[in-house]
């Protein structure tokens, strides 16, 4: 049962259009331990959706849920995570997941947190499972996988179990909520580097500020012409956090060394189909649009991890790796590996 103090804090928060991070932490912490009734959770999520997500909402909720979560055994310096908010309705191939594998094959320390499909036909877990990348490993085996390959995948529910308290209400509301934004931010590895796509460009600056609050040293938040990816069909807005400073700029496909394509050329299917398309790209047989879209995001990852001085040079590195078979060989080594010992 919700205590009077907790309920009074919640009511005050709902009436406050400009909450502080500390107030948000105070309101979201009871949510992490199941202290709210469903009606209270619905009121909180609906109010935030109606007035618009603020920096305090996102930063405070992130801090509350990270404090309640289970960190990955390896955290911090040198690690990267990558994900998007989803919700752009594009149903493309799994660009970010494919780019994460390219980045790992190229030396980026990638600890990717994700889940099965929610708003698309194929979530990151769906396509990785179809690629025979071992999933749902216990932490010790996941560490062995990471040490062997520069890559591991962490199921979000296993590391952020407190989110389960919200799921029934999220499903009942049937609209995007704060937790669509929070998902990629609640990275169990507490990474130093992050690339995150947002379907709603109004959130770009806010999320960059949240990453600064959470201690990221270098992060990119991107919105590409209506999608939560770096676009091959138009310009992409980038909010870049580097050493505490945030800059905003626009990049075009031509500026980073790729061609333009129609968004429809990136249309994807379910996990099995997208895995097949990914293998074709890794083997240099896939459509040029797929190669360039994956290279654009992988290039941003190489740049964010400070492996190259510009995104364009990162794109060139990714394209070279796809052309010479480096990624295909990496996948052949690491798919179906056991990591039991």
UniProtKB/Swiss-Prot annotation:
Keyword annotations of the record: Amino-acid biosynthesis, Aromatic amino acid biosynthesis, Glycosyltransferase, Magnesium, Metal-binding, Transferase, Tryptophan biosynthesis
EC numbers, comma separated: 2.4.2.18
Binding-site residues, Mg(2+) 2: 228-229
Function text: Catalyzes the transfer of the phosphoribosyl group of 5-phosphorylribose-1-pyrophosphate (PRPP) to anthranilate to yield N-(5'-phosphoribosyl)-anthranilate (PRA).
Record note on cofactor: Binds 2 magnesium ions per monomer.
Gene Ontology MF annotations: anthranilate phosphoribosyltransferase activity; magnesium ion binding
Superkingdom of the organism of origin: Bacteria
Gene name tied to this protein: trpD
Catalytic activity: N-(5-phospho-beta-D-ribosyl)anthranilate + diphosphate = 5-phospho-alpha-D-ribose 1-diphosphate + anthranilate
Residues reported in the UniProt entry to bind 5-phospho-alpha-D-ribose 1-diphosphate: 84, 87-88, 92, 94-97, 112-120, 124
Family: Belongs to the anthranilate phosphoribosyltransferase family.
Residues bound to Mg(2+) 1: 96, 229
Any one Gene Ontology BP term: L-tryptophan biosynthetic process
Protein name in the entry: Anthranilate phosphoribosyltransferase
Binding site for anthranilate 2: 170
Cofactor(s) the record lists: Mg(2+)
């Amino acid at each position: 049962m919700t205590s009077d103090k907790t309920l009074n804090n919640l009511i005050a928060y709902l009436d406050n259009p400009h909450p502080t991070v500390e107030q948000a932490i105070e309101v979201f912490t009871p949510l992490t331990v199941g202290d709210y009734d469903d009606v209270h959770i619905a009121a909180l999520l609906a109010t935030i959706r109606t007035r618009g997500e603020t920096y305090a909402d996102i930063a405070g909720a992130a801090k509350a849920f990270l404090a309640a979560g289970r960190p990955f055994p390896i955290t911090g310096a040198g690690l990267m995570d990558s994900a998007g908010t989803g919700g752009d309705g594009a149903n493309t191939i799994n660009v970010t997941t494919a780019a994460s594998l390219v980045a790992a094959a190229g030396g980026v320390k990638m600890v990717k947190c994700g889940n099965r499909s929610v708003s698309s036909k194929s979530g990151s877990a769906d396509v990785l499972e179809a690629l025979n990348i071992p999933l749902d490993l216990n932490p010790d085996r996941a560490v062995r996988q990471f040490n062997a390959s520069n890559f591991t995948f962490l199921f979000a529910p296993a590391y952020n179990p407190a989110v389960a308290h919200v799921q029934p209400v999220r499903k009942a509301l049937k609209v995007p909520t704060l937790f669509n934004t929070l998902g990629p931010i609640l990275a169990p590895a507490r990474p130093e580097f992050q690339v995150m796509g947002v379907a709603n460009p109004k959130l770009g600056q806010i999320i960059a500020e949240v990453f600064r609050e959470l201690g990221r040293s270098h992060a990119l938040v991107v919105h590409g012409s209506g999608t939560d990816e770096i676009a091959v069909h138009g310009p992409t807005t980038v909010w870049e956090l580097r050493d505490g400073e945030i800059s905003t700029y626009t990049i075009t496909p031509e500026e980073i060394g790729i061609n333009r394509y129609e968004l429809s050329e990136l249309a994807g299917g379910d996990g099995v189909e997208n895995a097949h398309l990914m293998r074709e790209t890794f083997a240099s047989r896939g459509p040029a649009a797929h190669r360039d879209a994956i290279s654009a995001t992988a290039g941003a990852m190489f740049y964010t991890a400070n492996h190259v001085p510009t995104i364009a040079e990162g794109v060139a590195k990714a394209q070279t790796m796809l052309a010479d078979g480096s990624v295909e060989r990496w996948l052949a080594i690491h798919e179906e590996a056991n990591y039991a010992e």
